[in-house]
Curated annotation (Swiss-Prot):
Its cofactor is Mg(2+). GO terms for cellular component: cytosol. One of its GO terms (biological process) is lysyl-tRNA aminoacylation. Disulfide bonds: none annotated. This is Lysine--tRNA ligase. The lineage of its organism: Bacteria, Pseudomonadati, Pseudomonadota, Gammaproteobacteria, Enterobacterales.
Amino acid sequence: MSEQQPQGAEQALDLNNELQSRREKLAALRENGIAFPNDFRRDTTSDKLHAAYGDKDNEELEALGVEVTVAGRMMTRRIMGKASFVTLQDVGGRIQLYVARDDLAEGVYNEEFKKWDLGDILGARGKLFKTKTGELSIHCTELRLLTKALRPLPDKFHGLADQETRYRQRYLDLIANDESRKTFQVRSQIMAAMRNFMVERGFMEVETPMMQVIPGGASARPFVTHHNALDIDMYLRIAPELYLKRLVVGGFERVFEINRNFRNEGVSPRHNPEFTMMELYMAYADYKDLIELTESLFRTLTQNVLGNTQVQYGDEVFDFGKPFVKLTMTEAIKKYRPETDLADLADMGKAVAIAESIGIKVEKSWGLGRVVTEIFEEVAESHLIQPTFITEYPAEVSPLARRNDVNPEITDRFEFFIGGREIGNGFSELNDAEDQAQRFADQANAKDAGDDEAMFYDEDYVTALEHGLPPTAGLGIGIDRMVMLFTNSHTIRDVILFPAMRPQK
């Protein structure tokens, strides 16, 4: 007898009865003693067993006589009279249990085991063997119920199809979907590998405030909260940049932080209001040094985490083993809109005409640099499929970046693109306190004119710069988007364990 859970309308009809049955079983467990025991200890996991013994035949396993103790969730059960097969799922994967009535303590098989339900958490002890079909299994001599599940598994174990449920009840998604578990395991591996990469290069990991009196470090609308004890409004940080650069002023010459940022903006397949970034700052370096570091970082991560510098994403293959493409912003516009006369991009009137001709609504507050940037985003960004660095961003859209020595209208800045989306942003840092003060003033004027994403004037940060910031370069990398690429995920919600969702009514 193979157990299957009812589907569709039948499942809805039977759910209340099943919930009642499970609660009655729990009540019986309470009457008989400890309903949720915590004295069972496992000594291995399924993945370790498959790795160590998966290639051995049954004769070898019998000769070895390997006894193991495992624990996990019962995903399937096939009862065949006096014996049963169970699929047990743990953090490493799945292992099959062979459960025979005569091998367990008296009464366990009929009075306990057969009354358990799919989804229950079990502990098992026994010896390894191979079935006639060659499946590695555990011949159980002890079997215990560790946790009674009061609700049934979603759609047996073939997957949880409803997207809303996957995001709202991520625990069900992780139980039901192998790919989801794999995605978040890869995410963890990426973050660990990033930390190793940075520490090996002399960077120190630090933590900076998540709540700030003045939000800064990026152009975005912040979340506002109130600090009751201080009786002041505060902001969830939109970026850690200005605090990290204060640390460089203080003498920590190589720092990085991996943490969440918050931006009170729209939700899309690429945007979540709460997201994870790594930011780093390196003294006595410029943006060209960070281009080299970024290329090395991604090549190292793909090789160490995925085992290959080629990454499959949909129909595309991103090759991190080859030198990355490098284009200036205007070169990218010319490449993907060949009819563009580059001289027109230096003329406000002509640049506005180009922007409007491709459907961009030009705001009165925009200067030439903002217009050119909008043109780039419209005509070129989606075409930047292979790993690409775009350089020479206008100073107007780069209020914290150092001006170029030859052309002060542009900055020593780059953005890094893969698959038509921005993954990273880096630049030589502006360390001229007077220039920074003027740019903050320009941003404040833009905010007064209605730009709610313009930066606040941070007087304390200007004071820090007046004490002297060494020549420094900084880089920010969006980890969520990186994980999307590495796991072939097409929405950011698939790589964030608990994404922002509208509350259910």
